[in-house]
Structures are given as C-alpha cells and as structure tokens.
Amino acid sequence: MKSMLEKINQLRDVLKHHEYLYHVNDAPEITDAEYDALLEKLREWESQYPELMNPDSPTQKVGASPSTAFKPVTHQVPMLSLDNVFDEKGFLAFNKRVSERLEAESSAQKASLNPLVRDSDQKNRSEKNVQEALTFCCELKLDGLAVSLIYEKGELTQAATRGNGFQGENITHNIRTIQSIPLRLKGKALPQRIEIRGEVYMPQAGFEKLNKQARANHEKIFSNPRNAAAGSLRQLDPHITAQRPLNFFCYGVGLLEGGVLPQSHIQRLMQLKAWGLPVHDRITLCTGAEQVMAFYQEIAQARATLGFDIDGIVIKVDDVLLQEKLGFLAKAPRWATAFKFPAQEKTTQVLGVEFQVGRTGALTPVARLEPVELGGALVSNANLHNADEIARLGLRIGDTVVVRRAGDVIPQIVNVIIESRPQNTVEIIFPHHCPICKSVAKRIEGEAVIRCTGGLFCPAQRKEALKHFVARRALDIEGLGDKIIHQLVDKKYVQNPADLFHLTSEKLLSLKRMREKSAQNLLNSLKKSQKTTFARFLYALGIREVGETTAANLALYFGQLDLLRKADIETLKKVPDVGEVVAKNLVDFFGNEHHQQVISALESVLDWPDPEPIEKPNHPFRDKTVVLTGSLNAFTRDDLKAHLISLGAKVSGSVSKKTDFLIAGENPGSKAQKAEKSGIKIMNEPELIEFLKALKPEGTKV
C-alpha cells in the first residue's frame, strides 16, 4: 500500500505542477489532452483506493493559486470548474447519472425553492416524468479565461479571474478596456447586484495579427490564443490590454441579489443578452441524448469556421430547480459536464527532413509533410526538436505518421504507423556540417541538440543574432524588422552587427518596400543606438545563457571589456549568477577569432560610459544579495533590478541564507514569510524609496 501511496502522491505533484504552469504562468508544458489523461489516471487510482483520498488532491480542486501581481478577490459563490467526458460512452454515463439521481429525488420531499429564481410560472409547474423534463442547454466550450463580472444597479464595479475557484485576481481596469463588455447594462428591472460569468478569449485573426506585430518588434510570441488572452488580462498596464484584440461571451450567473431571473438556464442567457451582454448565438436546447450528440457533431464540423478556439461543448441541465436538486461535487456541479473534442489528428506522410539553424547554432530538424488540413489550417511541417525525439518516434523519411495539433495549435508527430512503412524509407541522419555555412556541427556533452560551430560566420546564425542585437532590451534599434534584416544579410550589406552602423541611404533604398522617409528614420535610429551601456552591449552580443541580469552583473563586476574578455573560467565564476556552464560559454565566445573581429568593429562605432566607481561606505547595497517580491508601483521590476545592480547589489530570484535584503511590494507571498522566519531585513517600497533617497545627493532623483 505504501508504494501505491507514493505513486498517487507523485502523480498529484505532477498535476499540481502543470496546473501552476497553466493557470498562473500561462506557459503549459503539456497539451490539454495529456493533462486530462493524467487527471483521469489519478481519479482511477483514487477510486480504487478511497482510503488514500486527500482533500488537497487535484481531483478535488479547481485551478491554481492566483498570481500576486493583482489584489485578491474572494468569490462569494465559488467558481467551480466542470468535469469532462471525452466520447459518447462518457456522455451517456453522465446522462444516466443525472437521470437516476433525479428519479431517486422525485419521491422525496421537494427541496425548498430559492426565492431569487422564482418566476410566475413556478407555482403552477406540473409534475413531469423526470426523463421528459430533462432538457439540456448546450453551449460552446471556449478556450479562453473564465472571469467574473459584478454589476451593481447595472454598473460594472468589479471583475476578477477564476483563480483557484474560491479566490481570484482583481482585473477590473483591464476588463473595462474590452469593447464587448458593457460598462453599464441596459433595460429595466436590473438586479441590485448580479455576478455575470463568462469567458474572455482572443479571436484567431486577432491572435495572428498580434504575433505578427510581436515578431516585427522582436517581442515574445504567444503559443496560442488562450495564452495570449490570459497574458493580456494580466497586464499591469491597462493601456496594453486595451490594444489587445480581446472578446467576451457570458455563459451564466453566479451571485444574484435584489432581482429575479427565469428558472431556465437558456432563458437566463437570453435575459442577459437583452441587458446588453454578449451571448453566443449557437446555444441550443436539446432533449435527450440523441439531440445532444447531434449538436456535438454539428459543432465539431463547424469548429474550423468559428473564428475562435473551442475544445468541446458544455452540457447543462436547463432547469435551474433541477440544478439545485442535483447539487455539486467537490470541484464541479453534478448538473453539467464538458464534452471535449478529441485532439485533432490526421495521418500523412513524411516527405523529407530539413535542418534549421537558430541564433545559438542549434540544428533543429523539421519534418516536411504531405500537406494535410488539420483544425482549419493546412499543416505541411512539424518540429522534430532533436535527435532524441526522432529516436523515440523511430521515425524515417517516407513513414506514414499521425500528426496532431498540440493544444490545437502546434503541429507535432504523435507516432509512426509501422505497419504502413514502405520498403524504401530513409534513415534520418543529422549532418556533420552546418547546412548553411558548412562549419562543423557537433553535439556538446550533456545537451540534446547538435550545434553549428560557425558562430557569427554562419548566415543563418547571423540573421538570428542580428534580430537579437537590435531588440528593444538590447541595442533597441527601431524600424529594423525581420524582413529588412533578411534582405541586408542576403544582399551582403551586413555581415556582422557592426556593419549596421555603416549602412547608407542608397543601400537602404535598394531594399524592397523601403522609402526615403523610412530609410532616414532607420539611419536616425542607428545613430541614436550608438550611445548605449556596457550591460546592453553584452546582452546584445547574444552569448549563450547570458541574459539581461547576467550581462548587468558582468558589466558591474569587470567594468571594462578588456578585463572581461581576458577572464578565465575561475574568475568568471566569481560573478553573481555565473556558474561553470555560463563561464565556459563566455570563454568560448570571446576566444572565437571571428567574434573577436566583430567585437573590435563594434568597439569602434559604439560608445558607452565608463562605470562610476562605487564606494562601499556610501552604498549599503554594495556586495549585498537582494531579492524582489510582490508588485511594485514606483518602479518596474527590471528598472529596480538594474538600479540595485548599479549600486553594487547582487539580485537573486529566491530567498536563501545568502540573502541580505528582501524588497517587498504589494502581495509579497511566500518569499516574505521565508525571509521573516530567517531574520532577513525586509523593506517595503516606501522604505526603499526613502533609503535610496538618503544615498543620493540632495536634489537628484532616485
């Protein structure tokens, strides 16, 4: 029994990890189908061993804890999630459970009716056979973010995420920017207070446009519309949310005070629509299992034409009084379920494999497929990741494979249909030389990827390196998008980043779609970017594993480029956040002859101030380890981090014995508790501001 307990607890931990990634970080590592399979396995084990049930199990919970970036909101009526069914058999089992429970209840004394949902027909309601009365309201299951909207006397006063079902995040300012959500309800007989529940989502066209803009600006690309919607709602600046193409459909009511609603769920939705709230027009009343299955098939076929992502339908008992009789389980209502679509899969043939070269030289195999329509999109390639993945699949060129749109977005090969393998398949062999520059390609010990060793000599790496070099957090060169970079490299106008600063108006005007004004603006941006900082310069070089914080630490520690490029591994490891791997990457980068030439060329065109000497007695943060937590008002986290580093501090992401200070913003969370227990000095934001002011000469700004 002990081994079974260990298995169950291990699976619970895995599910909790993925719940956190999905609900809090908006960065899932597995598909919805894979998560559902894990949860189903846990349910099966807990059913077999009920004595091992734990109230904290993922089967008993709704979602992950709310982020600390927004103020918490407690839901007066819990926002529970739904149980899932995945096929007709599962739906019929749900239908049977509902019918049997209502039949068992019908002989008992009627439960007292909620006066808030009475209407004039309620008292005259005749006795009906349970099966005849059982009508379902069927809706689309949007793949977005569930939200709660509170209207008081018709005015929108609060909006919150679902969070863990009992406590969410206050996102009122961001919700007010969504055009489809009315700030005031229209009509008469509005309730004193009503909670509207619905889904915020991003239409597919808006998602594609958002990612296109992000690529042009060298910003983060969202993996799917759901993540884009969630990330947009969690922006601290509502102006950013206002620029995102978000939409909303409501699907129900939570809290109701001082008002009357119909006893039919679909009639309630029609009432909400009359008040000005958006309700999707494909909601349908279905009597009996046959009609529900017909609706399911209809929506499955229409799915690709909707213009937004759905992953199934939602089936709800329409009669609100019957909903009350059926009640709730720990995490979901008994009267509703989500009938999820299977992951979109089709078979096709692998025509070949090409190898793409990334910024750091990683050779990524991409399968070229016989084009196949999948979820409304024509899929003609799939990322194979690395040699280990190819070996796991046992994949060969010419194989027939099952392709799935993971999370309904990213094409991936699920498995090879071995019985369909022809005799003339070809083994996939990783090249020994880069397919672009012909430099040696080799696999580094301990890594799964094979890399081109050509560095910036490689045109493919050069293009990606240039995109990184001009990005906002690097040299911040406005107007230099991906298409322009590709043309500059292809025309051999730019061989390395230093060549950017020798571009002329004539060369720029020879590029496609380049006009005189755009060319001059780009030249102005290039000139402006020549004045930078040592830290930005180091980050812009694109050295593997050297992010903004590490670049800032290196700049602070060495102060001068000459000292940095002469440093050995042991010296580099003395820098905060630099370990063996990063130190070796730095030594290899600065030891590369081509890189040395590029850096020398950049030194001749860029200018950054020498670091100001930091006197220990005047700067209490010097050589101190500082941790930031909670949401800040006077600073952005990046700006404060950079300022602390400039004062000589080492900024860390976690509290440990080495931590000297904890800077706590609003809703600081567990880091503050740990720091307090460890006796670490904690400063709130006002205290920090006063502390920093005391370090500055009079009249200067923090």
UniProtKB/Swiss-Prot annotation:
The active site is at K141 (n6-amp-lysine intermediate). Gene3D superfamilies: 5' to 3' exonuclease, C-terminal subdomain, 6.20.10.30, BRCT domain, DNA ligase/mRNA capping enzyme, Helix hairpin bin, Nucleic acid-binding proteins. It comes from the Bacteria. NAD(+) binds at D32, A33, E34, Y35, D36, S81, L82, E139, R162, E199, K316, K340. InterPro entries: BRCT_dom (IPR001357), BRCT_dom_sf (IPR036420), DisA/LigA_HHH (IPR041663), DNA_ligase (IPR001679), DNA_ligase_AS (IPR018239), DNA_ligase_CS (IPR033136), DNAligase_adenylation (IPR013839), DNAligase_N (IPR013840). GO terms for cellular component: cytosol. Its EC number is 6.5.1.2. Residues 104-125 are annotated as: Disordered. Zn(2+) binds at C434, C437, C452, C458. GO terms for biological process: DNA repair; DNA replication. Its cofactor is Mg(2+); Mn(2+). One of its GO terms (molecular function) is DNA binding. Residues 616-702 form the BRCT domain. It is an enzyme of class 6 (ligase). SMART domains: BRCT, HhH1, LIGANc. It catalyses: NAD(+) + (deoxyribonucleotide)n-3'-hydroxyl + 5'-phospho-(deoxyribonucleotide)m = (deoxyribonucleotide)n+m + AMP + beta-nicotinamide D-nucleotide. Keywords: DNA damage, DNA repair, DNA replication, Ligase, Magnesium, Manganese, Metal-binding, NAD, Zinc. PANTHER family: CHROMOSOME TRANSMISSION FIDELITY FACTOR 18 (PTHR23389), DNA LIGASE (PTHR23389:SF9). Belongs to the NAD-dependent DNA ligase family. LigA subfamily. DNA ligase that catalyzes the formation of phosphodiester linkages between 5'-phosphoryl and 3'-hydroxyl groups in double-stranded DNA using NAD as a coenzyme and as the energy source for the reaction. It is essential for DNA replication and repair of damaged DNA. This is DNA ligase. It comes from Hamiltonella defensa subsp. Acyrthosiphon pisum (strain 5AT).
